[in-house]
Amino acid sequence: MARSGSCPHLLWDVRKRSLGLEDPSRLRSRYLGRREFIQRLKLEATLNVHDGCVNTICWNDTGEYILSGSDDTKLVISNPYSRKVLTTIRSGHRANIFSAKFLPCTDDKQIVSCSGDGVIFYTNIEQDAETNRQCQFTCHYGTTYEIMTVPNDPYTFLSCGEDGTVRWFDTRIKTSCTKEDCKDDILINCRRAATSVAICPPVPYYLAVGCSDSSVRIYDRRMLGTRATGNYAGRGTTGMVARFIPSHLSNKSCRVTSLCYSEDGQEILVSYSSDYIYLFDPKDDTARELKTPSAEERREELRQPPVKRLRLRGDWSDTGPRARPESERERDGEQSPNVSLMQRMSDMLSRWFEEASEVAQSNRGRGRPRPRGGTNQPDVSTLPTVPSSPNLEVCETAMDVDMPAALLQPSTSSTDPVQAQAATAAIESPRSSSLLSCPDSEPRQSVEASGHHAHHQSDNSNERLSPKPGTGEPVLSLHYSTEGTTTSTIKLNFTDEWSSTASSSRGNGSHCKSEGQEECLVPPSSVQPPEGDSETRAPEELSEKGTLPENLTQNQIDTAQLDNFPAEPLDSNSGEKNNPSQDSPCGLPEEGTLSETDRETCEQASTESATRHASTKPELPSQTEAIEQASTESATRHTSANPELPSQTEAIAPLAHEDPSARDSALQDTDDSDDDPVLIPGARYRTGPGDRRSAVARIQEFFRRRKERKEMEELDTLNIRRPLVKMVYKGHRNSRTMIKEANFWGANFVMSGSDCGHIFIWDRHTAEHLMLLEADNHVVNCLQPHPFDPILASSGIDYDIKIWSPLEESRIFNRKLADEVITRNELMLEETRNTITVPASFMLRMLASLNHIRADRLEGDRSEGSGQENENEDEE
């Protein structure tokens, strides 16, 4: 090897290291910086230690062992050299493990891990399983994405999650916390989902946080504190020293899937979902002088992307080394049998969304959306695409396409309640978190379908025009989202006016995985249960109270406008779904998704137009009483009727009855209070009536958005650095999973996993592509280099951990193959941006619906014909 000149003295240097004559780090830096060394990498070992996708891997400080976590909810400590498992730990997690770390300086005996249900476990491998199960933190609302330990600190660790908070825990203070709605350990409230964190190695008080608004925020932890320590700042801008965002993503919502500091702390590597990898210097400030986009430019960039194609859930044909772009498959005649059907469905959805977009444009600025045409049922209902407030950074656009109720009815009518089959279990349990792009664990990947009791009535048009209690018809709501772990999502809901399943009591917030976006928490459009037991509450009881669906619809909308709250999904007992004069109700938006009334809220918040609505509603008390009797979900009414609600609820309750100045003052006081609102998925409120949960969630969301808007305004006045992009690394594809890691390897290389099943390695300084390794049958998610030796560990959707080392005798980098893979990835990344993943139940429902519509038309034609014959007979 020395004779070839590629790595002179390598054997002698390795010999010196084994004899302890040279520092291992010197050998690592000397040879790891050479591209010929990188291009000799070869698969050395495969560790089959899990029964599910391996979502996190971590070397211990000495590089002897690997800690891994998986969909099988187990933690495993293995020896990659002997290929043996040291310890298998039943973690106590009930959902997919996303991140696990050894606590430093604990002799690898203490582990911290987090999972998709938001629970963090503090595990001591020397303690029994029952004791370890007691050491859990349930503080996060929604998914917890990552755990980060502090160098040389065995007692503290940080976490980030979907609720937009970064939390700091000290095991000397407590080793568990199951307090409901706990805010004691919040270090930073980002107002947007915090999906990744990183600590600067040489200066560990610098903390980088990646958020769902495409931003990377760097904080000085010395300026921060928690409520537990008594010095919580309560502002998302406190301690912020830099904020990075690529210019072309400033008005988009690409989630950060990975953050990584360089060893010297001088650069940060950030990987974006549905985009590329960027390198920036946190001390740079040259982007400050760039022009800030106007509100009109933001509005234009947030427009709905085209919907070109559908993908069935579980279809992983676009991942792995053998994946091909659609154009190439068409050219080679390799179309799958279901392509024709999927394409026809895609064309149909495209037409719906185009029509919805047109109506959304015409409805923008109106009080609420109105139905198209004068038919007895709305064909398409939409939400406007953007708010006008320039200070509120909006993650995404959304629209609800509500198909006629007939689309969900079976081909034969029935007067008996029919239980619609749920397409996913996401509503019932957080176990099925879809952040991991694993075929086995993707029950909620991009589309949610919730089943409810659907009372299928006869096809009498008079009944449809005049709905009454107990005769509500289900509505198919297609919620198109441009934010999530995929680039686009459709949410499918089967809802009924007067009934819902018991599962809705736990899951009014659900995870939507979008292949190519962030994972988003989406409350189903109409799954809130009525006050009390949703199964035993009879429709007749509600009808006796004299509240008509039409009145409820109008009151709900007026209330949403009056109180300036973000719109919340109406209770399944509200009558809006069956009111032919109204479109389907707007759902409480996921992060960044704004419904019609929510957009009005954003547009009017700066001027407090809600006070004007309040002063023009003298009939409010009577409406309140009627709606409360019907157990609907007006936030203001329920907060005023429930004195046991949290302080924010108490603060907002009397505002509707006060004069405008008092209302403004109260809102301002509440907004500046210490009760810091966080991003709360509706499913978090597991106790108490459904209407109470929704009321609290709406108020929390309202104040969270207010605080976020104010903090974004403050950013322009603060001395916060705004770095420019230093280098961009392309060629890989990051669109199907939320845990795609990018990492530094030594001082000269950058690497990342990819949806094509390869490991990509670039030159750090030139972005030249240097190496391509086939490492998974579907997706490579995790890459962790050995702390000293030139060894790399990788994992992904395959149920194993792969160990790579420079064993090839000569360079094996195939430039031609790499160029082909890069070209395909670029094409498929663009395809993924316009692809929506739907469950099989969605396709079956659509086919049944179209068949039912066709049958209805034929029946209608026959009825018209018989009617004409009868008229002729009467004339005779």
UniProtKB/Swiss-Prot annotation:
It comes from the Eukaryota. Residues 499-510 have a biased composition (Low complexity). The keyword Repeat applies. The keyword Repeat applies. Keywords: Nucleus, Phosphoprotein, Repeat, Ubl conjugation pathway, WD repeat. Interacts with the nuclear receptors NR3C1 and AR in the presence of ligand. Interacts with DDB1, CUL4A and CUL4B. This is DDB1- and CUL4-associated factor 6. It comes from Mus musculus (Mouse). The gene is Dcaf6.
